[in-house]
Amino acid sequence: MNWRSEHVWVELLKGSRKRGNFFWACILFLGSLGFLSVGASSYLGKNIISILPSQQILFFPQGVVMSFYGIAGLFISSYLWCTILWNVGSGYDRFDRKEGIVCIFRWGFPGIKRRVFLQFLMRDIQSIRIQVKEGLYPRRILYMEIRGQGVIPLTRTDEKFFTPREIEQKAAELAYFLRVPIEVF
């Protein structure tokens, strides 16, 4: 969701609460539970789940490996669920022409630096950069170059849905709003 007026442009960012993350967290959790139950069944010598016959699986080495995969999958699934719960990467970009201030806010992992808040003066913005990498894994990233600070990414690196036309359109609108040039790399 974006909001724009004559003097203010606010762009909200979704973060880690995406359908794909929910899907993979569920698949990983259920798959790792299956592996762990087969490993436990082979250790106990009984079927814990009647769907998965595990009496033919020896505990050493197959049951141990299945248990290890199950535990590793639960750890990775827990990590995904925590990033979804904490909504890591969400936030907003606010460009205020009236006040001459740019604010960038993102949520991070819990801790001292959970809230990432950057604030710049608009006159310090040198340009809007577009980085385009074509090939097997194409990337189109929008950056803002700040005098004395370097470049700050405005789009996520995993967003592959931007077509060249969409990224050019977004860069042109933002550069026009901020009154800065566009650079392409």
UniProtKB/Swiss-Prot annotation:
GO-annotated cellular components: chloroplast thylakoid membrane; photosystem I
Pfam families, A to Z: Ycf4
Keyword entries, A-Z: Chloroplast, Membrane, Photosynthesis, Plastid, Thylakoid, Transmembrane, Transmembrane helix
Chain ranges passing through the membrane: 20-40, 57-77
BP GO terms, sorted: photosynthesis
Cell location: Plastid, Chloroplast thylakoid membrane
Membrane-protein topology: Multi-pass membrane protein
Family: Belongs to the Ycf4 family.
Purpose of the protein: Seems to be required for the assembly of the photosystem I complex.
Protein name (database record): Photosystem I assembly protein Ycf4
Organism: Agrostis stolonifera (Creeping bentgrass)
Gene giving rise to this polypeptide: ycf4
